[in-house]
């Protein structure tokens, strides 16, 4: 019996910090409109990190995929002099138990193209591992064969601008629920700029905006939140009637696995 009890304890530990299952449940209104966003429940997106320069200025988002690795967008231009902040909700508060983590190595996808914005992904190897807790844990990565069909309601999070005209980004982490579009549908807005290395979401009254870049677009699969997109580009005015464009993670997984295995 004691052995069974031990097993059940391990099972609980697994679900506590297993990927894609927040210890603190997110609450979505479903009408959340990050332009027209809503505050997230503190700690409910535990993989969300803030990428900051040495002055503490937030310039991009990212996602923890393990204790040692963060995924973000290549166009963010992350350097080893930048820092990763995990466990943060309110950037205006000094009362949070955040983890400020140094970056040991930056792996920018060598096929990233600044003109086409294809392959917009960078992996960051942390100098010291993040300590997983109730408010810090990993998102699940998809398999290359996973299918997330158009119409799937997903969520993007970030500290990006809530209006493109605002001078400052919000202090509190914002969230927005938004549907995936087919690439054919997305091309009606963006034409030939859309490639199979991208996935679109939104045009539904919500939008990612400047400062959200590199952050997650997550969809639920088998009860766990899975990283489907990385905030990449969109309308310069963060129009909520135009879809945002995200790096399509299923297409980039082979490269991710190659880097993780070699390092």
Curated annotation (Swiss-Prot):
Keywords from the UniProt entry: Digestion, Disulfide bond, Hydrolase, Phosphoprotein, Protease, Secreted, Serine protease, Signal, Zymogen
Phosphoserine PTM sites in chain numbering: 93
Name of the protein in its database record: Chymotrypsinogen 2
Domain Peptidase S1: 34-261
Cell compartment(s), UniProt: Secreted, Extracellular space
Upper lineage: Eukaryota, Metazoa, Chordata, Craniata, Vertebrata
Native source species: Canis lupus familiaris
Root EC class: hydrolase
Reaction(s) the record says it catalyses: Preferential cleavage: Tyr-|-Xaa, Trp-|-Xaa, Phe-|-Xaa, Leu-|-Xaa
Entry-linked InterPro entries: Peptidase_S1_PA, Peptidase_S1_PA_chymotrypsin, Peptidase_S1A, Trypsin_dom, TRYPSIN_HIS, TRYPSIN_SER
Gene that this sequence comes from: CTRB1
Signal peptide: 1-18
Keyword check for Chaperone: no
A GO molecular-function descriptor: serine-type endopeptidase activity
UniProt EC number: 3.4.21.1
Catalytic residues, chain numbering: 75, 120, 213
GO biological process: digestion; proteolysis
One Pfam family of this chain: Trypsin
GO cellular component: extracellular region
Family: Belongs to the peptidase S1 family.
């Amino acid at each position: 019996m004691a052995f069974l009890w031990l097993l059940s304890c391990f099972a609980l530990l697994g679900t506590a910090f297993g990927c894609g299952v927040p210890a603190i449940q997110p609450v979505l209104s479903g009408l959340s409109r990050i332009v027209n966003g809503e505050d997230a429940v503190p700690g409910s997106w535990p993989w969300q990190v803030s990428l900051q320069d040495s002055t503490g200025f937030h310039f991009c988002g990212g996602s923890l995929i393990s204790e040692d690795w963060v995924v973000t967008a290549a166009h963010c231009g992350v350097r080893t002099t930048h820092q990763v902040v995990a466990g943060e909700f309110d950037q205006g508060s000094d009362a949070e138990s955040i983890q400020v983590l140094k970056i040991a190595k930056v792996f920018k996808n060598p096929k990233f193209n600044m003109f086409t914005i294809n392959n917009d992904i960078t992996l960051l190897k942390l100098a010291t591992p993040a300590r997983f807790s109730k408010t810090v844990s990993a998102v699940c990565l998809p398999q290359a064969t996973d299918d997330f069909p158009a119409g799937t309601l997903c969520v993007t999070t970030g500290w990006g601008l809530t209006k493109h005209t605002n001078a400052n980004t919000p202090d509190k982490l914002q969230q927005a629920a938004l549907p995936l579009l087919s690439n054919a549908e997305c091309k009606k807005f963006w034409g030939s700029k859309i490639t199979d290395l991208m996935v679109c979401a939104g045009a539904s009254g919500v939008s990612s905006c400047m400062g959200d870049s590199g952050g997650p677009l997550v969809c639920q699969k088998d009860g766990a939140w899975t990283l489907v997109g990385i905030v990449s580009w969109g309308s310069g005015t963060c129009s909520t009637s135009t879809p945002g464009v995200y790096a399509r993670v299923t297409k980039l997984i082979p490269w991710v696995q190659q880097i993780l295995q070699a390092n």
